[in-house]
Amino acid sequence: MKSIVISSNSSGGGKTTIAVGIMKALMKKGFDVQGYKVGPDYIDPAFHSQITGKPSRNLDIYLTGEEGVKASYSRGKGNLGVVEGVMGLYDGKGIDSKYSTAHVAKTLGLPVVLVLSPKAQSATLCAEINGLINFDKVEIGGIILNNISESYYNLLKAAIEYNCNAKVLGYIPKDERLKIGSRHLGLIQSSEIEDLEEKIDICSEHILKNIDLEELFKIFKKTPEYEDNFHLENKNLKIAVAYDKAFSFYYRDNIELLEELGEITYFSPLMDKELPKDIDFLYIGGGYPEVFIEELSKNESMLKSIKEELDKGLKCYAECGGLMYLTEAIENEDLKGNAVGYFEGFSKMTKRLQNFGYAQLEVYKENEILPKGLKINCHEFHKSTVELDEDKIFKINKTMYNGDTKHWNCGYIKGNTIAAYAHVNFLGNIEFLKALLEK
């Protein structure tokens, strides 16, 4: 597979718009495209998947390590890969570029196409571009200018190619039709945008018209065959995964590892009446249960089914929205609805982010599921809290940008159920997954 990385100088620079537009444009040209996303985000990969018809893949060095990123990348399918970056090109976990888009690009040996959305700049923009080019040994293959007029583009193209050792590939004109709304986790889910196909099609037409595709094709680079040693032995397990509009945040790596362990049955907490029969493990990922709390609470037979099975000792792992769903109730402004009620207490939405970013869990409580001292790299992003009268199992360690470390206890254990706000990629935490399933 040949691939490129789409990055920018900051968040909000147009990466997602350009990345999905390029994917669609390439597909119109007859290519089989694989989407990738740098970092832990769940939303952008859903856009990729909607366009390409295949699961997008997260490439996250903090959550999976460099070898995990290589393995996940190698599992992609298609002739061309488009990797959407995160934040600015060199922005990672701390004040250096570790775990950044640049780190991923260098790990995979891929060139970067910069997407920039300039305003009232010319020579200063060139200085910024030269800084991006010279900051580290990342191959900058070209530049796409976003959300500008044709006359401004002509001015900037001349300035950049005069002052910078960089090729300007084209531009995307200002177009109000390309705007996408937002929700508290960033972009809203692709399945909720009624005119998503139209927006993507408009963007792809701009790309076909205003981007030099011949030059873009020259930037795509073939990568070597990377080793993939992240596999598990089939245990003939029957695994139930909650999946619908309320619960859709799952890393593709996690699903594939569970598929290796046995057979996955997907079910909908919104629509189905009860859990699948004779299952060995229940996985409830994140999502937006607070948005659909009325529908979830009305499905009383499902709530009862889950609680009964957990009370009987069914093994379960729940993340973020899954944790909220297992409490007694979810409060969202004026809305309040009953949830599963396995954990004593409730969850409540907040206006501000409670925790955000990379961290590391450490099992500090003696228990029968996870070995004490086990460390698990994770990511948190939530605007809610839980108040539960249950045993906590993890100590979380979070390194701040200034180098200080914050600690607090989190995550809950009851019976054979473990639930926490943290999102975990099993590819980088194989021992954690094994422990969840081996009791």
Swiss-Prot record:
InterPro entries: CbiA/CobB_synth, Class_I_gatase-like, CobQ/CobB/MinD/ParA_Nub-bd_dom, GATase_3, P-loop_NTPase. It catalyses: cob(II)yrinate + 2 L-glutamine + 2 ATP + 2 H2O = cob(II)yrinate a,c diamide + 2 L-glutamate + 2 ADP + 2 phosphate + 2 H(+). The keyword Nuclease does not apply. The keyword Lipid metabolism does not apply. Pathway: Cofactor biosynthesis; adenosylcobalamin biosynthesis; cob(II)yrinate a,c-diamide from sirohydrochlorin (anaerobic route): step 10/10. Its EC number is 6.3.5.11. Keywords: ATP-binding, Cobalamin biosynthesis, Glutamine amidotransferase, Ligase, Magnesium, Nucleotide-binding. Its cofactor is Mg(2+). The active site is at C320 (nucleophile). One of its GO terms (biological process) is cobalamin biosynthetic process. One of its GO terms (molecular function) is cobyrinic acid a,c-diamide synthase activity. Residues 238-431 form the GATase cobBQ-type domain. The record marks H423 as: Increases nucleophilicity of active site Cys. It holds the Pfam family GATase_3. Catalyzes the ATP-dependent amidation of the two carboxylate groups at positions a and c of cobyrinate, using either L-glutamine or ammonia as the nitrogen source. Comprises of two domains. The C-terminal domain contains the binding site for glutamine and catalyzes the hydrolysis of this substrate to glutamate and ammonia. The N-terminal domain is anticipated to bind ATP and cobyrinate and catalyzes the ultimate synthesis of the diamide product. The ammonia produced via the glutaminase domain is probably translocated to the adjacent domain via a molecular tunnel, where it reacts with an activated intermediate. Belongs to the CobB/CbiA family. The a and c carboxylates of cobyrinate are activated for nucleophilic attack via formation of a phosphorylated intermediate by ATP. CbiA catalyzes first the amidation of the c-carboxylate, and then that of the a-carboxylate. NCBIfam families: cobB (TIGR00379), PRK01077.1 (NF002204). This is Cobyrinate a,c-diamide synthase. It comes from Clostridium tetani (strain Massachusetts / E88). The lineage of its organism: Bacteria, Bacillati, Bacillota, Clostridia, Eubacteriales.
